[in-house]
Design a protein with these regions (language model features):
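Long, contiguous interaction/recruitment modules in multidomain scaffold/adaptor proteins
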Residues: 2-56, 176-187, 196
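Residue-level recognition of tetratricopeptide repeat
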Residues: 66, 100, 104-107, 145, ...
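TPR alpha-solenoid repeat register
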Residues: 94, 139, 184, 218-219, ...
């Protein structure tokens, strides 16, 4: 029998190596090594096991925003609500809350433009909500509040009137859609009050209160505002305190309470101390939250001025400037405080920055920063109803410090007073101050004096001749 010697009869021979099979095995090994390395570095995570940083939900951002709001950190609350809207851009309730907080935050801003910018942002937010739900009572009520706040901003009269008309319409529709919308009734009462419709305003705020609205901060705040407009300041204080009890970390409420106590201090000097306590409470809350807000320090300084304590007033005014050395309005406020404290030369530097603007060297000089290490340029503030105080105080300081033949203060004052006359010639309170200072400099209102050439030397320190103490333009309510 023939036997093939190449065939093994007792065992199966191993197959020869397949190069494709070997290559596949190597690829699998390489892939496994890569997976193990990625797992070790945390780049991938095993299935069915929660990731270490879970994905945020809309509700988590809303809760975070509510927490920041209750703590009084309005900017952080706004950021949280904005993040919630990224996930649910059509959530009208979130947009309404965001717009409301933006209105509150506008109360804490120091310049007209900052307030206007924030309110316009609020209007954009609530307009999107209305586009999604045009018949939502909550949305329309909040929109009425935003429009009402814009109507009270420093805008041309025609724009203010248009915003107020829109606000009234939105509030009425909101109430018609839901007669239990207590905030809409409160906002409508505030709008009516601004239109001097006192009886109707009183009726609507009473409806809001009697239906359970006394547990809502805005209802209490607006009731306080109505009493304030009626000049019943003690009742206004009581209701502002009720509002602050509901929302204890909103500093603008404490500032308002302080302003009213300070106003009452002219009749009972012990009220000044109470005013200082509320302003200090607002400042303390800001420090606790890490918020740089000069408003409470300005209010404290103005209170000390009324108490006749010029040094304490100047210290607090300077503290406000340290907090915000970039804000033109802060220079104006500090300048007015210095003027009232009879620090006329110091006020001149500050007010020049606010009214005319100043370069880095001049702003350092105003802040008494020596050597000058900061590059802070201050832009001039436009002449408005709120900044005219800085303009005529600056002109008064120039006139009071003028030394004939030694400076050109009167020429500069004439320019400032002409600007004021062009816009406020029909305001007798402003014109009385302007006229008194013009008389010191012998300024003809119809003619700008030529610039005098100052002499190279000056003998002694000039003694200012103060004109009438600058006052805020009278309004229906005490101002900070």
């Amino acid at each position: 029998m023939y036997i093939d010697e190449r065939k093994n009869l007792f065992r199966n021979p191993r197959g020869s190596s397949n190069p494709y099979f070997v290559m596949a095995i190597l690829l699998v090994v390489v892939a496994l090594v890569a997976v193990v390395r990625a797992f070790a570095q945390g780049e991938i995570w095993p299935p069915f096991i929660p990731t270490p940083t879970p994905t945020r939900t809309v509700n988590s951002f809303v809760i975070e925003g509510d927490t920041h709001f209750e703590a009084g950190s309005l900017d952080k609350a706004i950021q949280s609500y904005q993040q919630a809207l990224v996930l649910e851009p059509n959530n009208s309730h979130i947009r309404a809350n965001l717009a409301t907080i933006m209105v509150y935050s506008s109360y804490t801003m120091t310049t007209d433009q900052e307030r206007l910018d924030r309110l316009n942002q609020a209007l954009e937010v609530i307009d999107l909500a209305k586009a999604d739900e045009p018949n939502n009572s909550e949305v329309l009520g909040v929109r009425a509040n935003v429009l009402s706040s814009l109507a009270n901003s420093n805008l041309p009269e025609a724009e203010q009137k248009e915003y107020r008309i829109q606000a009234e319409s939105e509030a009425l529709i909101a109430i018609q859609l839901d007669n239990n919308n207590l905030l809409a009734k409160a906002y409508y009462a505030e709008i009516l009050m601004d239109q001097f419709k006192y009886e109707q305003a009183n009726d609507y705020i009473s409806q809001a209160r009697e239906a359970g609205g006394e547990s809502l901060m805005d209802v209490c705040r607006i009731q306080a505002y109505i009493y304030e407009m009626f000049r019943d300041y003690n009742l206004a204080i009581d209701w502002y305190i009720k509002a602050s009890d509901i929302a204890p970390n909103l500093t603008f409420l404490y500032n308002r309470i302080g302003v009213l106590y300070r106003y009452l201090g002219q009749f009972d000097e012990s009220r000044y101390e109470t005013a200082l306590e509320y302003f200090a409470k607002a400042a303390g809350l800001n420090n606790q939250l890490g918020i740089d807000d000069p408003i409470p320090y300005m209010a404290i300084a103005n209170t000390y001025i009324r108490m006749g304590e010029a040094m304490a007033a100047s210290r607090n005014a300077y503290r406000a400037l340290e907090i915000n050395p970039y804000n033109s309005d802060t220079y104006g406020q500090v300048g007015v405080i210095y003027y009232r404290a009879r620090n006329y030369e110091g006020s001149l530097q500050m007010l020049r920055c606010a009214v005319m603007g100043c370069d880095a060297e001049q702003s350092c000089l105003a802040r008494e920063e020596d050597p000058c290490e900061t590059d802070i340029v201050i832009s001039p503030l436009p002449l408005t109803n709120t900044t005219v105080l800085y303009y005529y105080t600056y002109g008064s300081a120039l006139a009071g410090l003028h030394r004939p033949g030694l400076d050109d203060n009167c020429a500069e004052a004439a320019v400032v007073f002409r600007m004021i006359r062009e816009k406020f010639s029909d305001n007798p309170d402003v014109m009385s101050i302007v006229t008194a200072s013009e008389n010191i400099c012998n300024i003809n209102p119809n003619e700008v004096l030529p610039t005098e050439t100052p002499l190279p030397t000056q003998v002694g320190t000039p003694t200012p001749i103060p004109t009438e103490t600058p006052m805020f333009i009278p309004t229906l309510t005490p101002t900070p």
